[in-house]
Amino acid sequence: MSTISIICALAENRAIGHKQELLWHLPNDMKRFKNLTTGHVVVMGRKTFESLPGGALPNRRNIVLTSMPEAMGTTCIACATMEEALECSEADKEIFIMGGTGVYQEALAIADKMYLTHVHTTFNEADTFFPDVDYSQWEVVSTENHPADEKHIYSYAFVEYKRKK
């Protein structure tokens, strides 16, 4: 059985994007994302897929949830439902859910783990948000705090959660 993991960077007001772009540039967060997801399945919505600057993420099996699978081309696997996406991924030991909002909302009910980057600021201009999480259902496995520096304009924390049994 695969582990279903949500991966996301979010601001204090749960902001995750504006006009289909990230709100910040945190190189260490991008490096962590790449290290965790490389070699695994990544599941995302169509808008998230379309926002990727280079299209499908390399060295990962890209699954896109969309009601228009015929429009997705050959760089990814198009699935109509989360259930179908998970069936396509069942051979992988860990499946990463990488957004957007609706996909995260659906995944919260079934996820085993969350890898969240908590960015210590708010973005009032955001138009895309991570769903509300009932953190009482989650146990913190690890926390790694990072101050702002010359490459990272905001302080942030990498927090790994696992669902309480």
Predicted region positions:
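Extreme N-terminal starter segment of soluble prokaryotic enzymes
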Residues: 1-6
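Flexible, gly/pro- and Lys/Arg-enriched active-site loops
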Residues: 8-41, 46-165
